[in-house]
């Protein structure tokens, strides 16, 4: 069961593009606004005008918080931040082609699913990413680490998303104790 959360979806929640900040935001009632990192060039056209935070969005948000509670040990505030950004990415980002060429191939086969955390390796750097959308061959992942330089001119910043083929997702290192029978 979900522990007490800071923010549960309400009927008056709305997506809107903030011209002031140049990013998609979620109006969380009369006095609160949450800013996503997503700029106009990465958003679907509907996201550039006021848009209802629908029942489908609310269900995804709540389910995502539950998944985060199982996969990450983080504060409720961070769960809400990841879930709002994840919901925005899942529903309101333009479809992307995979950009796998930036990342090292994994030697292990992984099973990608919503809310699962993996590592991406790029130019000797290792970053943690969170799956926000998955298909048979590729996943849209959100960067959990602060920044990941992709090349000399481009970096992925925290909470930004990139689509990668599953063969680029590296499992997290898990240490397991083996008990003798």
Curated annotation (Swiss-Prot):
Quaternary structure (record): Interacts directly with FtsZ.
Listed InterPro entries: ZapC, ZapC_C, ZapC_N
TM stretches of this protein: none
Family, as annotated: Belongs to the ZapC family.
One GO CC term on file: cytoplasm
Keyword Chloroplast part of the UniProt annotation: no
Organism: Shewanella woodyi (strain ATCC 51908 / MS32)
Pfam families recorded: ZapC_C, ZapC_N
Function comment: Contributes to the efficiency of the cell division process by stabilizing the polymeric form of the cell division protein FtsZ. Acts by promoting interactions between FtsZ protofilaments and suppressing the GTPase activity of FtsZ.
Domain of life the protein comes from: Bacteria
Primary localization class, coarse: cytoplasm
Keyword Metal-binding set for record: no
GO biological processes: division septum assembly; FtsZ-dependent cytokinesis
Keywords of the record: Cell cycle, Cell division, Cytoplasm, Septation
Compartments where found: Cytoplasm
Entry protein name: Cell division protein ZapC
């Amino acid at each position: 069961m979900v522990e007490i959360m800071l923010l549960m979806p309400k009927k008056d929640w709305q997506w809107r593009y903030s011209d002031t900040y140049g990013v998609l935001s979620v109006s969380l009632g009369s006095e609160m606004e949450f800013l996503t990192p997503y700029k106009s060039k990465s958003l679907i056209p509907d996201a550039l005008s006021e848009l209802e935070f629908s029942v489908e969005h609310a269900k995804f948000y709540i389910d995502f918080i539950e998944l985060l509670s199982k996969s990450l040990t983080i504060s409720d505030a961070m769960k809400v931040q990841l879930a709002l950004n994840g919901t925005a990415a899942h529903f309101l980002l333009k479809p992307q082609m995979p950009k796998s060429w930036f990342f090292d191939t994994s030697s292990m086969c992984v099973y990608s699913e919503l809310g699962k955390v993996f590592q991406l390796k790029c130019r000797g750097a290792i970053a943690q990413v969170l799956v926000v959308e998955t298909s048979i061959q590729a996943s849209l992942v959100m960067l959990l680490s602060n920044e990941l330089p992709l090349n000399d001119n481009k970096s992925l910043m925290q909470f930004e998303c990139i689509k990668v083929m599953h063969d680029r997702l590296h499992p997290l290192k898990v240490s397991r104790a083996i008990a003798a029978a």
